From Swiss-Prot:
Signal sequence segment: none
One GO cellular component term: cytosol
Name assigned to this protein: Integration host factor subunit beta
SMART domains linked: BHL (SM00411)
Domain of life: Bacteria
Taxonomic source organism: Chromohalobacter salexigens (strain ATCC BAA-138 / DSM 3043 / CIP 106854 / NCIMB 13768 / 1H11)
Length: 98
């Protein structure tokens, strides 16, 4: 599901909100999650999951064109850990073949 599809689905399920209002709300939520992670924070949505940063250690990679080794710097990457309720619901749906 894309962001546009998510906005469309929410607008359909919440007819009292316009698509523009839903779009603005989704945009604000994503911006706030991004801002919190950018400042080193963690975002937890109970029952859904949590967003945090994980550090990837510096390593030696390879240039795919030449095969030459390339030193890659360490960096922080966003990480999502699903919550228990989300995991259980997904697993139950998959068991039913959805």
């Amino acid at each position: 599901m894309t962001k546009s599809e998510l906005i469309e689905q929410i607008a359909i399920r919440q007819p009292e909100l316009s698509a523009k209002e839903v779009e603005a709300a989704v945009k604000i939520i994503l911006e706030d999650i991004t801002q919190s992670l950018s400042s080193g924070g963690r975002v937890e949505i109970r029952g859904f999951g949590s967003f945090s940063l994980h550090f990837r250690e510096p390593r030696t990679g390879r240039n795919p064109k030449t095969g030459d080794p390339v030193d890659l710097q360490g960096k922080y990457v966003p990480h999502f850990k699903p919550g228990k309720e989300l995991r259980e619901q997904v697993n139950a749906s998959r068991a039913l073949g959805y």
